[in-house]
């Protein structure tokens, strides 16, 4: 099957299940399975993909249709340009937290402070 058609079909399934980020999710999942960046998908959209990739992709899309977060499906979440491994045992980093870290670092830019991270997630705040 052709890559762009595979993504389009999966995106439509997700859209019909009221998943707002349907195209983004479809692209993130297939790029993770193929171990390529999302830009690769745009540059190679007429590429034929193997049956094994399609099977893995279909399984992952079924998980997303059940509203499982993309981060759990792909096993990672980006935070401050760093990929952090995530699973159901850790909270997924949220964009709001990224903004909070940015604002705190800007506010205390020239001040010495102590911060305690009590480990409720994947460690992204501490490491970022």
Predicted features and spans:
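Non-catalytic accessory regions of SAM-dependent methyltransferases
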Residues: 1-34, 41-42, 46
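Conserved AdoMet
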Residues: 32-107
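Generic leucine side-chain signal with a strong bias for well-ordered alpha-helical environments
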Residues: 14, 24, 41, 91, ...
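Conserved SAM/SAH cofactor-binding pocket of Class I
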Residues: 96-128
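Secondary-structure boundary/capping motif
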Residues: 7, 38, 112-114
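A general structural signal for well-ordered alpha-helical segments in protein cores
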Residues: 7, 26-27, 57, 70, ...
